[in-house]
């Protein structure tokens, strides 16, 4: 409440405040992000009502409904914080970066046990040597961060997805037969295990 009141006369719009909440910039204010996102519209409305009262010096239309808290106060609702994956998703959406950690960090040990490749090694693959090369068969445990669908000449659907682990990201081409058979898997935010063939071409980024 105090932050919103101080910013009331500044050029701080609703989207700017919500962005600050989502990326964690306001975590030090004593409430969790879910609480702040829920409360911000109510606080804004209350501050606007208070401002109008001060201007008018009397009750008016905006005072018709009694406030749950006296002027100058706000009672924060009791809400549990969002789960970590949702917090990370919002951070990435707002800043382009994960700030609290990485959603794939908890899967690193599993990826190692499964003998999975990592995106750093795949991106650095050499056509003629190294751990991985063109046409190498690889497994990649990853989170899907982007899905771009395309209709082919045969009127089937394929997809280009961005697969990410703690080391970076790589593009994965999902051909029609696989995409149509497993469409539900290829959704942003899903953690999946990909079995694919590496494609390495000169002057192009490696892809699966």
Name every feature range the model reports, one short phrase each.
Residues 1-131, 197-199, 207:
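Sliding clamp-binding short linear motifs
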